Amino acid sequence: YEVTSPVPGDNVPIQLNNKGFFAWFEPICKLYMLPKYNELDLTPFFAPFFMVFFGLCLGDSGYGLFLFLGATLYRLFAKNISATMRPVLSLIQVLAASTFFCGLLTGTFFGANIYDIDLPFFQKMKETLFMDNNDMFQLSLILGVVQILFGMVLKAVNQGIQGGIKYAVAT
């Protein structure tokens, strides 16, 4: 056999090497597509957006609390959790926390509006956290624009890494 340096057309194996928080999102990135040998690993850039959008899509503090407690209890009481299951449980906890806090923005707990409860605690939360439909629409538009612009910048950086500055400027 012959050992050569990889060229752009080669199909070489890819090993993602993220640490800590970002490593938890690698299984999700692997579901879509691994980067090529000479491309950026987008996992660190993908993770925060996925976390926020997952929370906004599920958006119920009751579900978030349920998922968080379920993953935490499983982690505490299960014996011999496999090495592949630990990061999945951590990912569930992070996504559940995002869901819980996004549920506080909308004021839902298992589908019920918690801000209709006439208790001072919930009314204070409503004044500080609650977002009505217009606020949520504006937030989603802003997040969408930020994500698209950020993706375009990442594409330009990736093009610059692969082909040079003239390709980065052209994107």
Identify what each model region corresponds to.
Residues 1-171:
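Conserved, carboxylate-rich catalytic/transport cores that coordinate ions
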